[in-house]
Amino acid sequence: MDSNTVSSFQVDCFLWHVRKRFADQELGDAPFLDRLRRDQKSLRGRGSTLGLDIETATRAGKQIVERILEEESDEALKMTTASVPAPRYLTDMTLEEMSRDWFMLMPKQKVAGSLCIRMDQAIMDKNIILKANFSVVFNRLETLILLRAFTEEGAIVGEISPLPSLPGHTDEDVKNAIGVLIGGLEWNDNTVRVSETLQKFAWRSSNEDGRPPLPPKQKRKMARTIESEV
């Protein structure tokens, strides 16, 4: 196993522990707490994949961070902080919408890279809107936290989420996953719109009403892709 992979996991575990202590003091805002929950799932997945104990890794990560801080000058810290742009966290969904459980009558699922696409193919003839919470850096989508498809009644009928065991994705990965989700939903004669925030950063639509312009052949191809993977 690569030593950098292990040490990276150890540092991530310790930094998560620090953030958790911060949250326990009721100091974190909603985006902070949301990322904390997501990162916890990611660390569990990575720990399982690497065969490493999280508690042991946290202690090792603390030693690494302490060693770095001992060598770090205040001036170097200022320069490093200034050179890294702060991501903006954009939210279409409330915490309730993000954390709500949902069920599928006809579940379909596809894994595309490090993203998992899920939808209920029992849904037909509905008006659906895609909403997402994600971070942006340099005016580009950096990290997708969660994307969900909602009917006008507020029911959740689809979702795109990062796989905890496979962290890391690009804005193109997200665009492709959105295309697959839309294709599967429109196959059942649903009308799909994309939120203004998603249109701006993740899915640029040429239609004024926010409906993505997918040609029929592409929709059929995407729907078959979903159909073939459960």
Curated annotation (Swiss-Prot):
The segment annotated RNA-binding and homodimerization runs over 1-73
The gene it comes from is NS
- Nuclear export signal (motif): residue ranges: 137-146
Report the protein name in the record.
Non-structural protein 1
The highest taxon in the source lineage is Viruses
| Assembly information from the UniProt record | Homodimer. Interacts with host TRIM25 (via coiled coil); this interaction specifically inhibits TRIM25 multimerization and TRIM25-mediated RIGI CARD ubiquitination. Interacts with human EIF2AK2/PKR, CPSF4, IVNS1ABP and PABPN1.
Keywords per UniProt: Eukaryotic host gene expression shutoff by virus, Host cytoplasm, Host gene expression shutoff by virus, Host mRNA suppression by virus, Host nucleus, Host-virus interaction, Inhibition of host innate immune response by virus, Inhibition of host interferon signaling pathway by virus, Inhibition of host PKR by virus, Inhibition of host pre-mRNA processing by virus, Inhibition of host RIG-I by virus, Inhibition of host RLR pathway by virus, Interferon antiviral system evasion, RNA-binding, Ubl conjugation, Viral immunoevasion
Main localization (coarse): host cell
Q: Cellular location of this protein?
A: Host nucleus; Host cytoplasm
The record's GO molecular-function terms, alphabetically, read: protein serine/threonine kinase inhibitor activity; RNA binding
Task: State the residue spans of region: CPSF4-binding.
Answer: 180-215
Q: Where is this region: Disordered?
A: 205-230
**Record GO biological process:** symbiont-mediated suppression of host cytoplasmic pattern recognition receptor signaling pathway via inhibition of RIG-I activity; symbiont-mediated suppression of host gene expression; symbiont-mediated suppression of host mRNA processing; symbiont-mediated suppression of host PKR/eIFalpha signaling; symbiont-mediated suppression of host type I interferon-mediated signaling pathway
PTM summary from the entry reads: Upon interferon induction, ISGylated via host HERC5; this results in the impairment of NS1 interaction with RNA targets due to its inability to form homodimers and to interact with host EIF2AK2/PKR.
Per UniProt, what is one Pfam family of this protein?
Flu_NS1
- Looking at the UniProt entry, the stretches that span the membrane are none
Q: Where is this motif: Nuclear localization signal?
A: 34-38
The record's GO CC annotations read:
host cell cytoplasm; host cell nucleus
Q: Which HAMAP family match?
A: INFV_NS1
Q: What is known of its domains?
A: The dsRNA-binding region is required for suppression of RNA silencing.
Segments carrying the region annotation (PABPN1-binding) are 223-230
Biological source species: Influenza A virus (strain A/Duck/England/1/1956 H11N6)
The record's function comment reads: Inhibits post-transcriptional processing of cellular pre-mRNA, by binding and inhibiting two cellular proteins that are required for the 3'-end processing of cellular pre-mRNAs: the 30 kDa cleavage and polyadenylation specificity factor/CPSF4 and the poly(A)-binding protein 2/PABPN1. In turn, unprocessed 3' end pre-mRNAs accumulate in the host nucleus and are no longer exported to the cytoplasm. Cellular protein synthesis is thereby shut off very early after virus infection.
Family of this protein: Belongs to the influenza A viruses NS1 family.
